[in-house]
């Protein structure tokens, strides 16, 4: 109701919500991209080939520019089979013309600006016209 304390902050928080994240780190990655002035990424993008065959699903990204952002948590390295599946899935996505940017907790923590620059450069190379406004110094508590 009118005059309720915290209502503007609540509206901002609701606007940032996205049910597609499968981990807190995926959420933090998405929020970092938004804080860095990138377009809001789509989450859990299903990628199919030209015949409609399922290729894979990416954590988040930009379908328009075929730029995928993958957060690699420990499950991606949980044994040789998981590792092989991850490598194969990335190769299949790249064969469909996607640029895949892989991030991890340590990369986001210690090389945040480099990570954001990779996303910016990939999107610029694919035609994103607002690349100059990307803030590589954006931060969130990661």
PLM regions and their residue ranges:
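Surface segments flanking catalytic/ligand-binding clefts of nucleic-acid enzymes
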Residues: 1-142
């Amino acid at each position: 109701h009118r005059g309720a304390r915290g209502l503007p902050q609540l509206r901002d928080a609701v606007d940032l919500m996205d049910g597609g994240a499968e981990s807190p780190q995926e959420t933090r990655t998405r929020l970092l991209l938004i804080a860095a002035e990138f377009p809001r990424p789509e989450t859990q993008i299903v990628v199919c080939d030209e015949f409609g065959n399922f290729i894979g699903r990416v954590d988040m990204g930009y379908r328009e520019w075929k730029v995928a952002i993958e957060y690699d948590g420990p499950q991606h390295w949980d044994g040789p089979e998981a590792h092989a599946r991850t490598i194969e899935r990335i190769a299949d996505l790249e064969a469909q013309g996607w640029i895949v940017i892989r991030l991890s907790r340590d990369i986001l923590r210690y090389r945040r600006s480099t990570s954001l620059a990779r996303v910016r450069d990939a999107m610029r190379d694919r035609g994103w016209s607002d690349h100059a406004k990307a803030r590589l110094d954006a931060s969130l508590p990661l």
